[in-house]
Structure formats: C-alpha cells, structure tokens
Amino acid sequence: ISTSGPKVDYGPLREVSMQIPTIGLQFSIHESTDEARDKLIPFKAKLNLKEIAQEGLRWHEATGRMPFFNYCVHPANGTPEDADRLAALFDPNVWQATISVICERDEYVAAANARQKALADDFRGGLMSKGFMTRVFDPAGQDDIGGGCGQLWFVQDWMRKHPEKSKPS
C-alpha cells in the first residue's frame, strides 16, 4: 500500500496487515521538511513527517515488517543535510527507503534519466551510510508519474486547474 499519508485512522490497516503478511506499507514523503512537503503535496489533512514516522513505527511494531518511505530526489532535496533530517525522523532499524528516479519533462529522456539516476544513487549512498536499507526505483525514463505516489501529478494538475475547489497547505 502506497500512500501520501492522509490524516486517517490507520488502526484498520494495521489489523489487516497483521492478518495478511504480504501487505507492505510505503509513505510517499519526497521532502525532508514539512515546509517543502506542503508545497509538493498541498493538502491540509495529511500527516506531517513526524506523524508518518510514528505511524510507520506503530505498523512495524504490529506486523514485524519494515515500512518504506519513498523519496524522489532532485537537486534541491538530495543533500547530506536532507539525509541527516530523514535519519533523525525515520529510524533505520524500523524504516527502509525507496529512492525514486524522476525525469524532467523538458530534457531529452535518456539524458534526464542518466542525470536523475546519478542523483538517486548519490543520495542512496548517503542514506545507506546512515544505516538505511534502500532500493532505487528507476522507470528508465518512462512517464509513470501518475502512479505509485497516489497519482500526485494528476492531483496537482487538477488543483492548478480548479483553484477555487482546493485549499493548499
């Protein structure tokens, strides 16, 4: 289950996760501060990063399985300071990290993928040095941003087109 972390009761998810051992949990965080994450995911009724970390810990304690946080690295959020902030919030003994390669729409796909893959690999190394088990998701330049992260791009596009119906964080 991949989620951006709406503010809901996660108790039923923990219960079904205890009954079905193949259920995994991943939170799409993508930024190391709540301020940056609020700009990316502009919904008020969502968990902040500390609350996500706590919910993942509760899920881990209930299931014995490690949740993941998903992080799309770009030049402004792939610094050693970002890795430090994530390690301070998310215990590497509880959490694993998925680092997602993203491609810019204004670049030639192969060049964009190579550049973004290098960013992801560098950031992955920083997280591994903090004790995280990591994996890199690389769609190899395919445009799949609509899936995996709660269809974030489509939601952001809808909000831009309907500002009267949306309330940013």
What are these regions (language model features)?
Residues 1-75, 96-98:
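Core AdoMet radical
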Residues 54-169:
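Auxiliary Fe-S-binding modules of radical SAM enzymes
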